[in-house]
């Protein structure tokens, strides 16, 4: 029910993940399945998940979506996107959120290039734009859900930009759009 993705070597991570979020040196990431009515201590539960699975210094995301049914990946150039999607609680930035439901969109991007911290932040911006565009194009009146998670993982390096005018940004957008579209198709089919 879970997904664990170890790296061959430690990578620089920037995320809003509930476990080891922020700027972090990560040995991998995981998508942890939780019950749809989950209201536990996420910090304790993620630490316990890491311990039980013999992991250390992983970035952890949580979802009530059935991970084996919805996990989708797409590799475009140096960018690989891993997406789990469920959209029972669509939201629009700047509007009152709907009643919380446990489905979410998690996006983890693994980039096989050396990025500055600024480029990591730029990657999150580009990926968010791609996520929003995909949702709108598929007919969802939403910019995301109330609990979306996103993380980018790359080696530290000299690449400064990852916006939509760059080759890297174009690949980020394509990978996110492809993986998210497929994950949402799988999620809809599982309803």
Regions found by a protein language model. Give the residues of each.
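Alpha/propeptide regions of enzymes that mature by internal proteolysis
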Residues: 1-191
């Amino acid at each position: 029910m879970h997904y664990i993705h170890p790296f061959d070597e430690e990578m620089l991570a920037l995320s809003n993940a509930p476990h080891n979020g922020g700027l972090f040196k990560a040995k991998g990431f995981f998508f942890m399945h939780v019950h749809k009515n989950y209201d536990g201590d996420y910090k304790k539960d993620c630490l316990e998940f890491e311990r039980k699975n013999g992991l250390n210094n992983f970035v952890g995301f949580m979802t009530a979506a059935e991970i084996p049914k919805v996990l989708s990946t797409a590799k475009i150039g140096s960018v690989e996107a891993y997406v789990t999607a469920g959209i029972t609680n669509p939201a629009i930035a700047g509007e009152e959120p709907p009643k919380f439901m446990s489905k979410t969109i998690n996006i983890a991007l693994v980039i096989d290039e050396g990025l500055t911290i600024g480029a990591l932040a730029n990657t999150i911006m580009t990926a968010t734009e791609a996520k929003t565009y995909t949702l709108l194009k598929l007919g969802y009146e939403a910019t995301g859900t109330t609990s979306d998670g996103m993380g980018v993982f790359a080696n530290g390096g000299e690449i400064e930009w990852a916006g939509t005018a760059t080759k890297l940004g174009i690949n980020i957008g394509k990978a996110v759009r492809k993986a998210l579209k497929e994950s949402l198709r799988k999620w809809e089919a599982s309803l």
